[in-house]
């Protein structure tokens, strides 16, 4: 098959021969991966689609920065589930993007396993691999015991509280000294997965996510090529912050901050959950209580990155550099991009309340803080030549990094959040019940919303639905396999 015959964006859709005066129209609010995926699907189905994006760029919380002279993902950076079942895998294979696998299946640390790491205490002493392996095993046993606590409880509780109960019941699992500091580092990494502190994470829901097989892989080329492919040729209006959405029986009118109005048959809303929770967008009429409560019941986590480019590589050739400490907040984590990409870059990651504190600092203050950690671990560390600091929590276009399972989350909240309200459709990572917080979850959610929107509009207009949606996964025979490495 001629690659040029493939519709850019992973959806091969035949043109619909319309028997109406004008094509059906949809406004997509948000130009992140969910929004551009939805727009791509509808555009390929011969709908008139307008994407309104508040930023001066597409991608949303998928943001690849090139100011270091190499791609640095300051938002999402992993493919969670390096397998053909991942909805993004066929598109990644088609575009020839490389993946660096950082963990296999069932790693207790999620996107990392402890195959390539170096942990240090605050005195700069490296923790032995035997100690780390022993603590990792204990950490797994503690988490297994929290499941028993959950089964005994009628109501939800924080995961940290459950861990405390486990240690009270099983004193032999309590650790001391350097062992306990390594355990705190493991908790720190768990908090990073949820972008929330352990005293906020739901015991009932923390391990209920459907994790795909194949482990986790870094996007070596960054995520932007995927956004670029999906967005190509779409009508995307940048710097258009939506302030009001008015729905009528036969259409919807969207108003932006500068007073511009857009009208269409329907609207797909893909703005981040944090923006919806802040009530920045006014709905007329108001959303029904079941929808507004779903927005309120979902939690939003924060994880920020401090990326630093150096002239020389002075650190060990391992994937992860970590500093252990007496509490999770006192621990530190550096991702070594030189190992995965060959670029002399370290990325420090901060999650939960610590990520909020980082946002209050200037870029220089944030870099100085993490460099003080790095110099305790590696006294010969040099100063970075360039640096980048993300602030997803205070960014008015995101107001958070991704959704998370807070204590007391209702079982049906994801379904309610994703459900349409008349001609308003909702998509994004928070709308993905099985894969929230992931890029492929956001992508699949956008495709699903577009599919539902298309079918309903065509039915309302009495137009035959001639479209058979074909995602790239249905074309596996003509798509290159994933390029995966780990050295």
From Swiss-Prot:
Highest taxon, organism lineage: Eukaryota
Positions that bind FAD: 53, 61, 242, 429
GO cellular component: peroxisome
Cofactor binding, note field: Binds 1 FAD per subunit.
Alphabetical keyword list: FAD, Flavoprotein, Oxidoreductase, Peroxisome
Tissue expression from the record: Widely expressed.
Co-factor(s): FAD
Subcellular location: Peroxisome
Enzyme superclass (EC): oxidoreductase
Chief place of localization: other
Reactions catalysed: spermine + O2 + H2O = 3-aminopropanal + spermidine + H2O2; norspermine + O2 + H2O = norspermidine + 3-aminopropanal + H2O2; thermospermine + O2 + H2O = 3-aminopropanal + spermidine + H2O2
One MF term in the entry's GO annotations: spermine oxidase activity
Motif range (Microbody targeting signal): 485-487
Gene Ontology biological-process entries: spermine catabolic process; thermospermine catabolic process
InterPro entries: Amino_oxidase, FAD/NAD-bd_sf, Flavin_amine_oxidase, Flavin_monoamine_oxidase
Enzyme Commission code(s) on record: 1.5.3.-
Pathway(s) it belongs to: Amine and polyamine degradation; spermine degradation
Record carries keyword Chaperone: no
Function: Flavoenzyme involved in polyamine back-conversion. Catalyzes the oxidation of the secondary amino group of polyamines, such as spermine. Substrate preference is spermine > thermospermine > norspermine. No activity detected when putrescine, spermidine or N(1)-acetylspermidine are used as substrates. Plays an important role in the regulation of polyamine intracellular concentration.
PANTHER family, per database record: FLAVIN MONOAMINE OXIDASE (PTHR10742), POLYAMINE OXIDASE 4 (PTHR10742:SF264)
Family statement drawn from the similarity comment of this UniProt entry: Belongs to the flavin monoamine oxidase family.
Full protein name: Polyamine oxidase 4
Species of provenance: Oryza sativa subsp. japonica
Lineage of producing organism: Eukaryota, Viridiplantae, Streptophyta, Embryophyta, Tracheophyta
Gene transcribed to yield this protein: PAO4
